[in-house]
Each structure stands twice: as structure tokens, then as C-alpha cells.
């Protein structure tokens, strides 16, 4: 095949301000100095084995908490919780809000559970609480925080899953998640989506 003869006219190079091309939204809970829990809506994460890598913005309460207390819970909401997530999307748990965040509308709010209409659950071994309304809650330990030399706006946080909690309605055969029952909340270019119908599965699927 001569790739030089392929028609490329239906494509156009653009320069989007954001690269949120469709990933799972999650609510990261971390421990405040006074022992209370902070909730941070996020969408940058990926998993490999039992390790979950998080992209966490600098200047916020989440990274401050993770640097001081290396535990967290990765709470995964379903599409029905998008409004709860959005209620706290413009809040920061940090009193001294960075100028850039303040400029785009962020304000201070400590009681995020109340603001979001969500309920705390005690975790099994970590100090930050889990979120009852989220069908999946992953207690995790921070293994490493890396500040890239090429970018000063975020940290790459490597975590190890310690305990994986799932709502009984989405569990299949004891230790599997039923893909037909579980739909994550997807953050797609700053819009919220659920999943559509299944189109297929990988050869390694056990369900």
C-alpha cells in the first residue's frame, strides 16, 4: 500500500486547549491536616496491574495532602452522579487559591461532602474516607510522586491499590466486575457521558 496516495482531506489539524479525549471521571479523597477528608474531581488516570497512575494538578489541596499523607481513595462514580461531581468542580479545599484558578472561578469550600450531596464511608485501612454513592472505591497507597522537568503544572502520582470495594449489583462471580452492569462516568472534552452498548471484548476477557 502506498500511503502517499491515501486521501487525507477529511482530516484537519487543530489546536485544542484541552486533551480530555474521553477518560473515566473519579473523585479522589485525601486526608486534610485536621483529619477530615477532601474530595477532588479528576479525570486523568490509568491502571497497570494493581497500580494506578494519577495526573494531579499542582497548587491544589489534593497534591498537598498526598505529599503529606500518602494514602487516598479513588472513587469511581456512575453517570447518574455527574451533577454531584459538577457541584464541587469549581471548589478548592485550599484557602489560598492560586491566581489562575481564582481567575477561572474557583472558590474555597472545605465541606465538599455536604456540597456534593455525598456520603462518607469508613475505609478499611487508609485514613481518607470512601464515597458511598460511588459503585467502585479503591483504597490506595502513594508509592511515588514525580514532578516532570518538562511541565510545572502537574504531578504524576503512582499509587498501589490496597482494597477494591464494589457495589454488589455490579459484581460477577465473586471477583469480577460485570461490564454490562458497570458504566463509568466519562469526561469527554469537558462534557459528561456514560457508556453506550457493548461492541466487543478482548481475547483476554474472563467474563
Swiss-Prot record:
InterPro entries: Flavin_Rdtase-like_dom, Flavoredoxin, Split_barrel_FMN-bd. Keywords: Flavoprotein. The keyword Nucleotidyltransferase does not apply. Its cofactor is FMN. SUPFAM superfamilies: FMN-binding split barrel. GO terms for molecular function: FMN binding; oxidoreductase activity, acting on the CH-NH group of donors, NAD or NADP as acceptor. Pfam families: Flavin_Reduct (PF01613). Belongs to the flavoredoxin family. This is Uncharacterized protein YdfE. It comes from Bacillus subtilis (strain 168).
Amino acid at each position: 500500500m502506498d500511503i502517499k496516495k491515501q486521501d487525507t482531506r477529511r482530516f484537519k489539524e487543530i489546536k485544542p486547549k484541552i486533551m480530555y479525549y474521553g477518560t473515566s471521571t473519579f473523585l479522589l479523597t485525601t486526608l486534610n491536616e485536621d483529619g477530615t477528608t477532601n474530595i477532588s474531581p479528576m479525570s486523568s488516570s490509568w491502571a497497570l496491574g494493581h497500580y494506578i497512575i494519577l495526573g494531579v494538578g499542582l497548587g491544589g489541596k489534593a497534591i498537598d495532602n498526598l505529599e503529606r499523607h500518602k494514602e487516598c481513595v479513588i472513587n469511581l462514580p456512575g453517570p447518574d452522579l455527574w451533577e454531584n461531581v459538577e457541584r464541587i468542580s469549581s471548589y478548592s479545599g485550599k484557602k489560598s487559591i492560586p491566581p489562575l484558578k481564582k481567575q477561572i472561578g474557583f472558590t474555597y469550600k472545605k465541606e465538599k461532602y455536604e456540597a456534593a450531596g455525598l456520603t462518607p464511608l469508613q475505609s478499611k485501612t487508609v485514613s481518607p474516607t470512601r464515597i458511598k454513592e460511588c459503585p467502585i472505591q479503591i483504597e490506595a497507597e502513594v508509592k511515588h510522586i514525580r514532578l516532570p522537568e518538562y511541565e510545572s503544572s502537574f504531578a504524576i502520582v503512582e499509587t498501589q491499590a490496597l482494597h477494591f470495594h464494589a457495589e454488589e449489583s455490579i459484581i460477577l462471580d465473586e471477583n469480577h466486575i460485570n461490564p454490562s452492569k458497570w458504566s463509568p462516568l466519562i469526561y469527554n472534552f469537558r462534557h459528561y457521558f456514560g457508556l453506550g452498548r457493548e461492541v466487543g471484548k478482548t481475547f483476554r476477557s474472563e467474563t
